[in-house]
Amino acid sequence: DMRAVLLAGAGDNGGDGLFAAAALAQEGANVTAIAVGRSLHEAGFASFVRAGGKVLVLDPAADIPGCASGFSAGEAGERLQTAIAVARKSHLIIDAMTGIGIQGSLRGIPAALASALGLDGEAPDEPALPNRESSGDFPLVLAVDTPSGVGVNDGSLPGPYIPATVTVTFGAMKPCAVLPPATFACGRIELLDFGFDIDDKDPDVEVVDNSFASDAVRLPRFEDSKYSRGVVGLVTGSQRYPGAAVLTASAAARANTGMVRYLGPERAQNMVLAALPEAVIGKGHVQSWVVGSGVPEASVEGTDGDMQRDTIAALLKHYALGSEDENKDAYDMPPIVVDAGALDLLPERVPGQVVITPHAGEMAKLLNRFETAASTAEHADSHEPYTADDVRLNPLASAKRAHELTGATVLLKGAVTIVVDEDHVYASGSAPAWLGTAGAGDVLAGLTGALLAQQDDVATTGETVASAAYLHGLAAAIASESEQQGWQEPELIGREHRQRFMTLGHPIVAGDVAHAIPEAIADVIA
């Protein structure tokens, strides 16, 4: 016999769960509803009882018709342990404890259940399978609208939560379904379209797709030259890490630009020319800059005499905001991608055409530096230091804070990459997990600089950067022949879908991604 357990809250989500549980009971399943609050949705409860479902109440203060209440604290503890045991032995758990109205972490009985049945504040650690396919272990978990315990609006994991095998969401996608790390707790996402009129609504998060990214690709004109198609200037690579120069140049050259100019040490110059004879060595007019990839931070031993850092520092001074004249000069500068070893050279305030591209560890260092400066300037108490794990567990808040502190457009790298500018949040989850490989960030930096060089208006910087993240992931998917992604589009309930096994793909190196960029661009503009 199929055994199912419903974790039912008092609200409408609990009601939806009760109706679903009633349908299962009518089909012959052995269904137990565990009431986690003091009441249950009236109509849903009546339907469930008529179908022969059983109810286990956990709160002594509950007022649910026909169910025990007023029991002792000792019995309440025994009931909780019984509920946990029944849930663990079931084939299916329907998670309908909480809805979109909850703020912060779970508390009380829901928190105790989530701690026992799920995870507490850490992201799921499991193989990245295509379409979030389940390992098949029981119990499977079906979340109603959102998994209980995730940060609905910011994608965080503030405390105990229950990872879902499948999440059925209603009307529209919730931010937690697309933002990391909560999106990884949603499993496969099924969307029930209620026909809501949301076209005139500003989304909390914009998910990048082919159509979105195509706008960032400048189609060639009949009268184009190498200069009008966009020239990218690179101050990347170093004596220590010359390969980064090759990767940024290779990516930029393959991303629809007319020319790549390279500035760097002789060893890196020779490697760039060997890999890309089309590159031009030396200074000249550019439409965008990429700096810092493969350049050691100041904290790395032996970087005192690194001319790359001196060149980058001199260039970034032109982007520093301050006096009225300085501001005008800064806003007149071309877009610049500040990556890796250049992040510690970033001025205190910069305009939005400055793009920073940290991973979680680099973001933690950057936030600590700028928070300390802000606290000193405001004579405020020092902040608690950020760690890389802090950033990974709440990347949206970290990216927003970095934008507030610096003014830069922020690209925070991850399985789902987040881009934040003055008015928007973008999420791109096109990349397969195979993209976690050395040099992938260098390729992204070069690709981003190339797309920025093609734009006429710096007001589109955020959209362009988000499109670069998407194309980067798409190129990795092409190179690895993988259909696994950081974020999968939901299935629309009611539409016919052909069930098929998706392709996991194979390992790649960063150079493979750079070489797949032209095919990715062809895909989005087709």
Predicted regions and their residues:
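Internal gly/pro-rich beta-alpha loop/helix module
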Residues: 92, 97-206
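Short gly/ser/thr-rich secondary-structure transition/capping motifs
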Residues: 58-60, 71-79, 148-152, 213-218, ...
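Short secondary-structure boundary/hinge segments and terminal tails
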Residues: 42, 65-66, 79-80, 152, ...
